[in-house]
């Protein structure tokens, strides 16, 4: 479960010396560290540090990681995993963000028409627009937010030119 997070908290004297490390379990799995308890010894933890795990019951077993990441690990161009330096491995972990998918001309035209009619959508109208254009409600909501910011910027630039 990608919602499970490991949180390492170093207990220090001042608020500046206090540090916390958060990582996504998918990143740990990608780095080959999910089932390896030795990775903890490589982190900069003192004797007064403690490790807390949120949602321990929801943590998937190690087999689930290897199944889920089998397709991700298929590319042969990733750097080799160094078990002595897990922090460096996290730098090469892949993002879980979806790829950018530009809107079609039809979708953009319909969204622009809707925006000209009304800059703000009700929940019901957002649902309708999303259904008609085969988009998610979240995509429609964010498109409208971005479009309003674009209009604000255009108006600001126009006022500056005058």
From Swiss-Prot:
DNA-binding region: 96-155
Locations listed in the record: Nucleus; Cytoplasm
Principal subcellular localisation of the protein: nucleus
Domain of life: Eukaryota
Biological process terms in GO annotation: anterior/posterior pattern specification; embryonic skeletal system morphogenesis; negative regulation of myeloid cell differentiation; proximal/distal pattern formation
Family: Belongs to the Abd-B homeobox family.
PANTHER family xrefs: AGAP004664-PA (PTHR45970), HOMEOBOX PROTEIN HOX-A9 (PTHR45970:SF3)
Protein name per Swiss-Prot or TrEMBL: Homeobox protein Hox-A9
């Amino acid at each position: 479960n990608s919602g499970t997070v490991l949180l390492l908290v170093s207990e220090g004297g001042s608020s500046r010396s206090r540090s916390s490390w958060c990582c996504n379990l998918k990143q740990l799995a990608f780095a080959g560290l999910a089932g390896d308890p030795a990775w903890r010894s490589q982190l900069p933890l003192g004797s007064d540090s403690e490790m807390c795990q949120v949602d321990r019951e929801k943590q998937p077993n190690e087999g689930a990681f290897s199944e889920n990441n089998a397709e991700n690990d298929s590319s042969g161009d990733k750097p080799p995993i160094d078990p002595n330096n897990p922090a460096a491995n996290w730098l090469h972990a892949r993002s879980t963000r979806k790829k950018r998918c530009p809107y079609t001309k039809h979708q953009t035209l319909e969204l622009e028409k809707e925006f000209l009619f009304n800059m703000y959508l009700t929940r019901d109208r957002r649902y309708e627009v999303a259904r008609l254009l085969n988009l998610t409600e979240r995509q429609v909501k964010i498109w409208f937010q971005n479009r309003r910011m674009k209009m604000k910027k255009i108006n600001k630039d126009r006022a500056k030119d005058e």
